[in-house]
């Protein structure tokens, strides 16, 4: 017959069938099955006088052997031969063996005395001395191992439950992935005490604390520690996906019941199934990152929904949510102390709680860079792992830079927090004080208060749907925030690109956002006091050190002019009574003010303009105009954004609309967020004679563009056009013939870069077809080392 032992087993049971098959062993199998332990079953094996190779293989392929010694165990040569094999695997293969003494004295088994010895003596009659020696040795050694004696338990059921738990812990020990989280044992012990395992009553508790204190890590470690005690268990991190409240609740219940009952695709017709199905069931439930009271009401509405001894843990940042759900027992998680933070850093950096000799000062400085936030400690500590002293010094120098500090801060954010990034850097001569304002709907805004008292507020959103929620909040609350914090500018861009980039969603309150060092202007001031756009001095439009952010604004009289949202503390540009941003009619601005030469639409405001610092009527001063920095991502608004309109031929409006061309004067304006790389890119494009001729004449296939046939093949795209950009900024460039298309994408963390990769893997063909993009970089930090990725993504 075909062997059933071709697979591995968790447990091999060795027992005398006549004594315990339909009693103890049957109940033991049930307990093991409840814990998803794969147990060998010999029911289909034909018994014979000699043990079969099939059984020998099953013993070898099992991780644990359970030997049940009963009154008539020794009457079976089959059992004794299996025991010899088990003892051999214990010695040679380090297999785990657990003896169970069922209504028999362990000393009688070890010494083959008493009633057990009498039965064994009968079995040995007619056997060779070699067989008897093997059996006696196996009985003595296995019976000496730590096991369970029924006489020590109040009931058989309690003993079997404990055996199943012990086996589960040996097979699936709690994860040690949390060992680097110094102090986690204290958290777990406190939570176990709060859950009251000494009580038969079901209990629900909460874990609460600020973001990035390790609440989820603590919750997962607790779940890992307790899960072996619960057949029905679930670690839940659901979020709202469906607009309809009722449909969303049905979806949550179906997912929850499928997971906790281990049944695929459970379907329910109406809400309330959780209470109906689990009210007599002992469960372990951990709800992570809860921010929706409806989730609690749907899945754990009442403690009476669950059976006795059930344990439910709710993890959230919102204490008011726990209060609203009447969760009285709350465990507060704070940031680790300086001592614990230092130990945590050392665990990640050195694999132990303290630094080795010669690294004390270096470790102290590195730990201070990370602060007391667990994720930052993990990121920084892991960065120094296995580095020598010289490499430590070099790495510390890198971490002192603003870029790495920003990256650490960003990596500290949780999944939702990383959808909203708020960052700003002022001039090095300014004393900056930063504080987080936690706004409605989970939006985080960073206020930078300069030494002169004025405030810059920057809001960056990468999720368009969440940005819409942010807009609603700003519409209702912006005036109050601006007045309270003396805000002089705001950027409400959504995702670093698209037609809405740079538009303010709070036009009603924009007039209150033009704070000057002298104070804020009010919205009630007459428009007659407002300067006309023509009165704006040209010298206001100039390079003002790094971190300058220019944006166009519409005055109260309808005229328009550029406006600095941010400038250095030494040059504060004053433009009063801007009411809204320019969502339409931008051509009028450039017709009236041809000194406007571009807009910085970068994410962090850290790009500086190339070329000379001032703008004249004839364009940029000097011969080397450099790159047209800050090109618009909205093709329709970019048509007239050239410094020298008189020398630029009219551009086909169709091409701008359909292909999002970055500037009207052609291919030299491919824009990169790194000035040094931009110059290289411009220079390489200018060397192309065909491109140069096209720029000079303003004619050719550019204006006669009919379709993909006019585009150079992907193979002709010079890979040197894919430039490296600093500080971990994620850039994707798709360059057509000479550079017509520029696709720019900014990412600040590997997690978000991975998300971008997933999106591109699913949609890049469609994007290529629509925009004729010839190449794209999928790397995390803009280092285009993997040319295979670029080649792979080129269209056929």
Curated annotation (Swiss-Prot):
Gene3D superfamilies per the UniProt record, alphabetical: Helical domain of apoptotic protease-activating factors, P-loop containing nucleotide triphosphate hydrolases, Toll/interleukin-1 receptor homology (TIR) domain
User: Where does this protein have compositionally biased stretches of type Basic and acidic residues?
Assistant: 607-624
The UniProt record lists the keyword Iron: no
Region of interest (Disordered), ranges: 502-537, 607-636
| Top-level taxon | Eukaryota
Question: Which is one Gene Ontology cellular component term of this protein?
Answer: cytosol
| MF annotations from Gene Ontology | ADP binding; ATP binding; mRNA binding; NAD+ nucleosidase activity, cyclic ADP-ribose generating
- The protein depicted here goes by the name Disease resistance protein RLM3
Source taxonomy lineage?
Answer: Eukaryota, Viridiplantae, Streptophyta, Embryophyta, Tracheophyta
What's the gene? Answer: RLM3
